[in-house]
Amino acid sequence: TYDPTGSGSGIEAVKNGTADIGLASRSLKDEEKADGLTETVIALDGIAVIVHAQSKVTDLTVEQIAKIFTGEITDWSQVGGDPGAISCIGRESGSGTRDGFESITGTKDSCKLDQELTSTGGVIEAVAGNPNAIGYASLSAVEGKDTVKAVTVGGVACTEAAVLDGSYAIQRPFVLVTKDGTTLSPVAQAFFVFATSKDAASLIQNAGAVPTAK
């Protein structure tokens, strides 16, 4: 069975033997590896930073993005755009996309959002309708959209290739966590083999992530 309780709970369950496999949306910490846990990356999640389609801003650094979302940078003219008060659009508390974005940019619990929306589509729509807005969304949700544009981050575009080779900064891994020296049950072993194979790639892609098995 699958019990979606968050990365920490999944890791702890494998550690104490109550689960064969844990799913986490972050890499294992050194102390977790020291406890005999192993991670297997099955997918990567690229988080695009989006602005209005007509915005003059095309590139931002991770530091600039963090300063915008924490209210240190408040006007587009500070980062090469036309003058205008920046409107920050984000996801609601508890959103995996928000958690990933804030963890990577170092803005956890310090983002100052003008709007908190409950769907990726809502964020894209809000940014598309406001020339001064900035937001974030999974790469797969932004691809092919002409109502918003994804800025490059440190000169690197948010593409599958850049996520896979690690050059795009705002990304996180999805990992399967197992315990060293523990034999998986037949069902768990079958799932592990499938999840790490090319056969699972289309399912992972449809869920909005970039599969590592090609």
Q: What kind of feature is each model-predicted range?
A:
Residues 1-214:
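Exported/periplasmic ABC-transporter solute-binding proteins
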